[in-house]
Amino acid sequence: MKSIYKYMLCACMAVNVSSCDFLDVVPDNVATEEHAFADRYTVEKYLATCYSKFPASANRNSNPAIFGALEMVLNSEYSTDKGMQYGLGYDSSTSALINFWSSGLYAGIRECNTFMNGVVNVEDLNEYEKQRMIAEVKLIKAYLHFYLLSYYGPICPLRESPPVNESTQGVRVYREKVDDCFQYIVELIDEVIDSDALPLIFTNPTTELGRFSRSAAYMLKAKVLLYWASPLFNGNTDYNSFLNHNGEHFFNQIYDPTRWTVAAEACKKAVDICESAGVRLYQMSDYVATKKLSDQTLLVQALRGVISHRWNPELIWSNTASVVNSSLQTECFTYFETSTSLSNALQKMSVPLSTVELFYSNHGVPINEDRTYDYANRYSLRTGDAEHRYYIQEGEQTAVLNFDREPRFYSTLGFDRGKWYGNSYKNMPDDDAECLYPKNRFGEYSSAGNPGQYNATGYWPKKLVSINTTYRDANSITWESYPFPDMRYADLLLMCAEALNESKDAPDAEVYKYIDMVRERAGLNGVVESWSNYSNHPDKPNTKEGMREIIQNERKIELACEGVYYWDSHRWKTALSEQNRLIQGWNINASSAEDYYVVTPVYTQSFTYKNYFAPIPESEIVKNPQLIQNPGW
């Protein structure tokens, strides 16, 4: 089979310049449907079009999860960008900031329906090829429905596309109850799994990467069931007055604990399938170093490679419809020396202290729980020493907060005087302790370039910059793009730990097993050992509630800056308590260390109950009065 990847790229470019109204009764491709299924070549292009309908994970203005929880922010000059406006709580039903209801996803679902109806008649495809493509498109259809459900709550499942001659009244659909929506999505995925049509292992990776595998189907099912079991969708009495036209609750009002058991079984099955397919956690041995590195630098680079090392063994499915290219990376990158060209590293994206402080100490427990960590003085100054030379420049001052942190802190974040190995023609020294680092105090080479090109908090999301992106010289950069990692194994392992913990009366070895796999890869000891030896709450891992907090924090750390926290904080219903806060950083306008390392407000974040779901655009309700608006909008 020809490579579908190139067709995906072309389709992605096309979808960016087109739109489609969900209520249009004429399918997008009705005029060319006969041609679309003429032969193998046109069908492969159509399949790529279906894949291109996925939400653009790497687009900060169309992915609500990048800035939606403000785990990352833009500087104030770009605070009016749609993504930031969404995160700051300025969405509205009359002018929806990120609108998936009117276009895009429903259009993609219609494309999927058309594809499944038409591909069966293509003569130069064998039956295996047809069934595989149908399974792929059915999984795409399930994914798009799930995304809509996660974002809007009750949706209008598009089981079949309406005929072209359907009346206006006939296409005016109703929102269905949440449980019915979830049930339909699970049924779609089960049909895919039961068909056994998706490959366990790609036989020709160069032409198949980016397509769905059996592992992806099982992980998606596990994720859907995990969400269905979570507080937002399971017995959510906050929506007791949100009723459909028949006076029935859109959200079930009685908590069902057995859903966690079902989710746990699905997660374990997904883990088993992934293991049989060779999916595993990315390790230090997977990172190819050109020079001998210290264990510290090697681990940091490997943890960066988890995200940006293309098609690495941890990736279950990467979104080739949304590539992390120079557009996003340049906003996360910085300068390592004086440059005469200030258009390479735009450095608009920053990580606030609320995210920075989540990462564990080097003992693998929260810094506010570590009995040995100088938490009270974390904003004070400390000078880099030989012990920390692979993380912080020796002899330079930075905050206590940046010392004695776990390896994921240093792989995820760049900071003033913090080592940043690689990514430059002169940044792979024989002794990696001599690698370059940002200098970000006012007037230094990493501080503001052109107007608006500065880091607002003093922390860069280094994680999102490819390990193979590099300065060719002081003034030019070669960017290496990579597909956004929408499904990866570490996420699945933590999902498994969460579902198991919630399904049991108290955590046990099975719960610890899955979270400890992720921690071990990050260079940390197991949960029980770490809390027993260093935490001022040594018994926390022994209770269901304690492990819930630990697992949630582990997800916030392991998946930081990947847009996962936005969805997690919604399904856990923790956003209301966590996201009414000051967004803070360092005083980036100061030139001395004493003045720079002063906690400084950047934004005020607000969140209310209505923000758990986005509003249906008012224009859609005008067109279809049968749609009921989400509460609060």
Give residue spans per PLM region.
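Flexible, polar/acidic helix-loop-strand segments at domain edges
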Residues: 327, 333, 353-354, 358-369, ...
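Conserved, well-structured interaction surfaces
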Residues: 39-58, 79-152, 168-209, 214, ...
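Long, intrinsically disordered, low-complexity segments
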Residues: 20, 105, 184-186, 208, ...
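Short coil/linker segments at helix-helix boundaries
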Residues: 154-175, 232-262
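Short coil/turn linking the two alpha-helices of tandem helical-hairpin repeats
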Residues: 149-150, 156, 227-236, 502-505
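Bacterial Sec-dependent N-terminal signal peptides
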Residues: 1-28
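Membrane-proximal, proline-rich intrinsically disordered regions
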Residues: 20-66, 243, 401-403, 617-633
